[in-house]
């Protein structure tokens, strides 16, 4: 079963989010780029009060851990993200895209 990851950051801006993606060589707007193996879905959003959320589904926690160790950790630093996120994992029991 796939795994759901929710990351909640305090004080991360849209500019920093875009910088991290540029460091990774991915473009969330077009879907093009060097997306990590094991990533199924990626969503990101900003909330009031300077909070940023990333919600992803992965084939396994191990696949995400490998991505974090080999690419994402360094890209976060180079992109200016120094805050440690709140991390929540859950087993994914449903994923639907009714609108397309």
Q: Model-derived features: where do they sit?
A:
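Short S/T/G/P-rich N-terminal loop/turn motif that feeds into the first structured element of a domain
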Residues: 1-70, 80-100
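Short arginine-rich
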Residues: 75-79
């Amino acid at each position: 079963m796939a795994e759901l990851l929710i990351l909640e950051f305090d004080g991360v801006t849209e500019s920093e989010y875009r910088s991290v993606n540029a460091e990774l060589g991915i473009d969330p707007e077009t879907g093009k780029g060097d997306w990590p193996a094991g990533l199924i879905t990626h969503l990101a959003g900003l909330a009031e009060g300077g909070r940023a959320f990333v919600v992803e589904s992965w084939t396994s926690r191990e696949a995400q851990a490998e991505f974090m160790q080999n690419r994402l950790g360094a890209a976060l630093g180079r992109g200016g993200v120094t805050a440690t996120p709140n991390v929540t994992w859950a087993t994914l029991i449903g994923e639907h895209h009714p609108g397309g």
